[in-house]
Amino acid sequence: MSGGKYVDSEGHLYTVPIREQGNIYKPNNKAMAEEMSEKQVYDAHTKEIDLVNRDPKHLNDDVVKIDFEDVIAEPEGTHSFDGIWKASFTTFTVTKYWFYRLLSALFGIPMALIWGIYFAILSFLHIWAVVPCIKSFLIEIQCISRVYSIYVHTFCDPFFEAVGKIFSNIRINMQKET
């Protein structure tokens, strides 16, 4: 196990479990962890979640915050009975609340599994395919740029210098005839 450390937005330090003997990359892993005792260290995979504020980064503020008043409105002069309005409000609110709970109970865990797999694949591809491809491309481009630079300095520079010298001696005299 590694001793990788991560800090979240609240300043908590997370780490994967630390072995007593360390590992081949960080043999003094346990000693390093004890030095950081002033910060509370959490396991990255068992991070405590907030059951009250479930959208701490406000991802869905503009999208799914739909209340009864956002969907159904009666303008002045066109009002239903007060009892109907109250019953409609209650029906809408309770139906939305419980149907969301039903859908999340049925599909929440399977969707979390699917999205977990998707983002794991995405992370894997980024780490093991995209970044190495970009790095190799940059290495190849650097090699090609050196060859291109030699070509330009060998062939193009002398040619354009010669053309520049040819045209540098051209003089234009304008005279007005009377």
From Swiss-Prot:
UniProt record, GO biological process: angiogenesis; angiotensin-activated signaling pathway; apoptotic signaling pathway; basement membrane organization; calcium ion transport; canonical Wnt signaling pathway; caveola assembly; caveolin-mediated endocytosis
Membrane topology of the entry: Peripheral membrane protein
Region (Interacts with SPRY1, SPRY2, and SPRY4): 149-160
Residues with PTM N6-acetyllysine: K5
Pfam families associated with the record: Caveolin (PF01146)
Intramembrane segments: 105-125
Spans within the Cytoplasmic topological domain: 2-104, 126-178
Modification(s) after translation: Phosphorylation of isoform Beta on serine residues is constitutive. Phosphorylated at Tyr-14 by ABL1 in response to oxidative stress.
Cellular component terms (Gene Ontology): acrosomal membrane; caveola; caveolar macromolecular signaling complex; cell cortex; cilium; cytoplasmic vesicle; endoplasmic reticulum; endosome
Signal peptide residues on this chain, from the entry's feature table: none
Region of interest (Required for homooligomerization), ranges: 2-94
InterPro entries given in the database record: Caveolin, Caveolin_CS
Region (Interacts with SPRY1, SPRY2, SPRY3 and SPRY4): 131-142, 167-178
Keyword Protein transport: no
Single annotated GO MF: protein kinase binding
Interaction with CAVIN3 as annotated region, ranges: 82-94
Residues recorded as bearing Phosphoserine in the entry: S2, S9, S37
Functional summary from the UniProt entry: May act as a scaffolding protein within caveolar membranes. Forms a stable heterooligomeric complex with CAV2 that targets to lipid rafts and drives caveolae formation. Mediates the recruitment of CAVIN proteins (CAVIN1/2/3/4) to the caveolae. Interacts directly with G-protein alpha subunits and can functionally regulate their activity. Involved in the costimulatory signal essential for T-cell receptor (TCR)-mediated T-cell activation. Its binding to DPP4 induces T-cell proliferation and NF-kappa-B activation in a T-cell receptor/CD3-dependent manner.
Family: Belongs to the caveolin family.
Record's subunit section: Homooligomer. Interacts with BMX, BTK, GLIPR2, NOSTRIN, SNAP25 and STX1A. Interacts with PACSIN2; this interaction induces membrane tubulation. Interacts (via the N-terminus) with DPP4; the interaction is direct. Interacts with SLC7A9. Interacts with CTNNB1, CDH1 and JUP. Interacts with TGFBR1. Interacts with CAVIN3 (via leucine-zipper domain) in a cholesterol-sensitive manner. Interacts with CAVIN1. Interacts with EHD2 in a cholesterol-dependent manner. Forms a ternary complex with UBXN6 and VCP; mediates CAV1 targeting to lysosomes for degradation.
Official protein name in the record: Caveolin-1
Native species: Canis lupus familiaris (Dog)
Encoding gene (name): CAV1
